[in-house]
Amino acid sequence: MVTTSRTVLQVNISIVVEHRSTEHWFFDKQGKLQAWRDWRLQLSDMDAETICQEVATWWKFVPLVTKTFDPWREETWPDPWTLVSNGSFCPSAQGLGMFYSLVLSGVDCRLILAVIDEQPRLLVEVLGNKLLNYHDGEVIDDDFGEAQFLKHWAPSDLARLVKV
C-alpha cells in the first residue's frame, strides 16, 4: 500500500470522533470483521433503546461513498461479511449494515426500502415505531416526514444473505 499525506491525515483525524474510535475502518478485511464482531458482542449488555442509539451512532462514522450497491435490486446487496470487509458505505449500505448488526445481535427489526427526498434509502424499523438511518446517527420516533415506504423485509426474508 502506498501511503500518501492524505491517507495519514485521514487516519489521524478519524481515530477518535465523538469519543469513539473509528480506526477499525482502516484495518484489513479480517480486522474490520473482528472489530464489528467485538462491537456487536457489546450490544448484548444493553437495553433495547440503548442498542438502537448505539447502532445508529456506530454506523454514522463509516467511510462514505456515493453508491456501493443498488438499493432497488436486492440481488446486488452484499452479505454482512462482504459489506463490512469492503469498508466503504453509501447511505443504503449504512442501513443494511444496521439491519445486519441488529439481526446478528438477536434484535427484532425489519429492513425498509424508502424514498426520501427523491433518493432510495434502506431504513431499519425497530421496537415497532423507531427508524434508524433516516438521519445519520439518530433514532427517529413516529415522525417520518416525507418518506415513502415501498417495501419491507423481515430477517427471514433475507435468509440468503444472513442466517437467523
PLM region spans:
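A structural boundary/capping signal
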Residues: 1-164
